[in-house]
Structures are given as structure tokens and as C-alpha cells.
């Protein structure tokens, strides 16, 4: 799904509003926004939309990254050739953020915060006073609480929300407009996967595929019958 066709789901709207607020904050206020929540809640989808909307730089962290690898990834996203030392690279990033006025979105930030590389984030913010959007797993707020210099620069905490029934209906209609999926079936899917957007997407595709195979134009819970709903658990072995 491209950023131009992203459905305006709950978390997409929440993050977009928070980025807008941070980008237009008074100069005396801090500029960090943190979205956090379980895997599969659509945080990266929200980040892609916000990056497109605000022309933000976007970096997705990796667990294996060192401070240097993290800074090089940011500079590559900015189209800047990295200098030799970490200090010089921090200055390069900060200067570009200040000069461009563009936010930077750092996804899977837990991989940086759980290491000494977290201090690099503080240095970048202090040197740029820019808008930094940090996105990560549920443990991110607790991890940041141990980093007072970073923690007290947060303007807004944005807990990612489980998908609502309205989200599921909107996603089904926009992704598979040729097949009408009833609210009772979509509600059952949502409840079974506890609002996990990634697993909802898997189930919508399975429903769509089954509808094509059976020439269904409409699918409700009764039609779906005893067919399985993917919850992430492997099926029980058959004896």
C-alpha cells in the first residue's frame, strides 16, 4: 500500500495530529513526539503517512546498529555524505534539521534507546531543536524514563490504539471494494486478533480470496461458517 493510498485509520490520524502540533509548537517548548505500542498496531503505516504529509526524514532502526551506523543511516536519508567522527556526524544531522525545518521520524527506536546510542538522540535534539518523532514498542516509555535528558524533552506521548471496528470496515472497503464484508464478520475478526492491524489485514485477504473462490459478492459471519480466523497461533496438529 503506497503512502498515497493509506487509509486514514485511528493511529494514522493520531500521529499526523501529533506531528502537526510539534511542528507548529512555540519555540520554548520541547519537540519530541513518541508513539508507542504493540507490534502490528499500524505504527509504521502511520509513520509513512506522517512522513509523506510533512516531508519528514524517515529512518527505520535495526537491532544490530551502532551509534555510527545509526548516524550514517540518517545522513544517507538526508542525502549527505557522512564525515569521519561521531561528533561531526551529529553536527551534520542537527544542521540539516535546523536548516530544512523538516521533522525526522525514527521508527523501531527501541533498538537505539536500549543501547548507548540513545545519547545520540539527545545530542541531535539539543543541537538542532528540531522535531523528532520516535516510534517504537510498548517498552519505549519505560526505557526513556531512565534517560532523563531525553525523557523531559517529550512534548507528546501517543499510545497506539488497537484497531476499532470502524478501522476494520474502512480497511476492508478500501482494500477489497469488490467484496462486501459484513460488520458481524469484521467484528469477529477484530475481536479474535485483539485489534492487531497486521493480523486483520491477513484475515481480510483470506476472506477476499475465499470469496473469489466461491463467487461470493457478500460475506457475513454465517457464510464464513467454521472457516478459521488467523490469530497468529499455529493450527493444532491433526491426529
Predicted features along the sequence, with ranges:
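Sensor-1/coupling segment of RecA-like P-loop NTPase cores
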Residues: 33-39, 124-148
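Mid-core helix/loop region of P-loop NTP-binding domains shared across ATPases and GTPases
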Residues: 66, 72, 81-107, 111-127, ...
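C-terminal alpha-helical "lid" subdomain
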Residues: 1-17, 40-49, 54, 149, ...
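A short helix-turn-beta junction within AAA+ P-loop NTPase domains corresponding to the substrate/partner-engaging
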Residues: 56, 145-162
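Phosphate-binding P-loop
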Residues: 21-30, 97
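Conserved catalytic segments around the Walker B and adjacent sensor/switch elements
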Residues: 51-63
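Class I S-adenosyl-L-methionine-dependent methyltransferase catalytic core
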Residues: 5-8, 75, 83
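Walker A/P-loop nucleotide-binding motif
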Residues: 27-47
Amino acid at each position: 500500500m503506497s503512502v498515497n493510498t493509506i487509509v486514514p485509520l485511528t493511529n494514522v490520524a493520531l500521529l499526523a495530529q501529533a506531528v502537526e502540533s510539534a511542528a507548529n509548537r512555540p519555540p520554548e517548548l520541547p519537540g519530541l513526539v513518541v508513539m508507542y505500542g504493540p507490534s502490528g498496531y499500524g505504527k509504521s503505516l502511520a509513520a509513512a503517512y506522517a512522513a509523506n504529509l510533512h516531508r519528514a526524514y524517515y529512518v527505520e532502526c535495526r537491532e544490530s546498529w551502532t551509534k555510527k551506523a545509526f548516524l550514517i543511516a540518517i545522513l544517507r536519508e538526508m542525502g549527505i555524505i557522512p564525515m569521519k567522527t561521531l561528533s561531526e556526524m551529529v553536527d551534520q544531522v542537527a544542521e540539516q534539521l535546523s536548516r530544512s525545518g523538516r521533522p525526522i521520524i525514527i521508527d523501531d527506536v527501541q533498538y537505539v534507546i536500549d543501547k548507548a546510542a540513545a545519547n545520540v538522540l539527545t545530542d541531535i535534539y539539543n543541537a538542532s531543536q528540531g522535531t523528532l518523532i520516535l516510534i517504537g514498542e510498548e517498552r519505549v516509555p519505560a526505557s526513556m524514563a531512565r534517560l532523563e535528558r531525553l525523557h523531559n524533552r517529550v512534548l507528546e506521548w501517543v499510545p497506539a490504539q488497537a484497531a476499532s471496528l470502524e478501522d476494520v470496515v474502512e480497511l476492508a472497503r478500501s482494500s477489497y471494494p469488490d467484496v462486501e464484508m459484513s460488520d458481524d464478520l469484521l467484528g469477529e475478526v477484530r475481536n479474535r486478533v485483539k485489534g492487531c492491524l497486521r493480523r486483520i489485514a491477513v484475515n481480510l485477504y483470506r476472506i477476499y480470496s475465499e470469496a473469489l473462490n466461491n463467487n461470493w459478492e457478500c460475506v457475513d459471519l454465517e457464510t464464513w461458517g467454521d472457516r478459521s480466523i488467523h490469530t497468529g497461533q499455529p493450527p493444532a496438529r491433526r491426529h
